[in-house]
Design a protein with these regions (language model features):
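An acidic, charge-biased composition feature
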Residues: 2-3, 15-249
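Bacterial N-terminal signal peptides that target proteins for export
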Residues: 1-11
Length: 249
């Protein structure tokens, strides 16, 4: 994957809240994902999502490394293939003891024909099938690629936000997702494992290590590399955080 140093400065991943088999895995391929340009609302384009629901046994923590594995080995190659057709995209990570459970989502803005191709490629990926067979992934959900239900750039932003924030946020979270994926890529590049012969279990073990290293980078460098520079973009103005107090980074 190409370095994301050309992305808008100050983009940061905030609030990341974000199994066994024996099938061989296809060799990894590097990807090259270009940054977004400004996108106008378009009646022939809209938002779609492909969602992976993980196996999450009771009394165990979420397997966050599964998000990392799927993002890097399933979604990233598709992003590379269709980057000229995808205007904006992002990842969404969540885990709660409800019907969705631990769910990793790839959300993207494109036209109907491209949505169909992108959705089909992800759903029909050999690794997707292996993860389902192994029981690591319970279900893969996707929206009807023939129907645009969320046409505006702001259509998937939080409706409680002011309109300007709704319209700007998709660019922010696009950059956040790219930065996180680049961290994953850089971590993988340092070790360069021979993944072609890995079983599903071995691949999961490897991405558990990758995910841990990415989390450590966030824990040790996130305050300055991400939060401080994000605060700088806004002129070091204070911000109301969850605890309802002002902070600067």
């Amino acid at each position: 994957m190409r370095s994301l140093s050309s992305l808008p400065a100050g983009l940061v991943l905030l609030g990341v809240a974000f199994f066994c088999g024996c099938a061989g895995i296809a060799p990894e391929q590097s990807v090259n994902i270009a940054p977004p340009e400004h996108v106008a609302d378009n009646s022939v384009k809209g938002w779609w999502a492909v969602r992976f629901r993980m196996n999450w046994p009771e009394d165990t923590p979420p397997s966050w490394y599964m998000d990392t594995l799927i993002a890097h080995r399933v979604v990233a190659p598709t992003l590379d293939h269709y980057q000229d057709r995808i205007d904006l995209w992002r990842f969404h990570r969540r885990a709660s003891r409800d019907s969705a459970g631990h769910q990793f989502s790839f959300i993207f803005y494109t036209d109907v024909a491209s949505a169909r191709l992108i959705t089909d490629e992800i759903r029909n990926d050999a690794l997707t099938a292996s993860l389902i067979r192994s029981g690591s992934v319970r279900r893969v959900l996707s929206e009807d690629p023939e129907t645009i239900t969320k046409p505006g750039i702001a259509a998937t932003s939080d409706p409680v936000w002011p309109p300007a924030v709704q319209q700007a946020w998709p660019y922010f979270i696009d950059g956040v997702s790219r930065s996180w994926l680049e961290l994953v890529e850089q971590t993988v590049q340092r070790s360069r494992p021979s993944v072609g012969d890995m079983s599903i279990s071995a691949l999961q073990d490897y991405y558990r290590t990758v995910d841990k290293e990415v989390q450590e980078a966030w824990e040790t460098q996130g305050r300055h590399a991400f939060l401080h520079h994000l605060n700088a973009i806004f002129g070091y103005a204070p911000v109301v955080v969850y605890e309802k107090k002002y902070m600067k980074f």
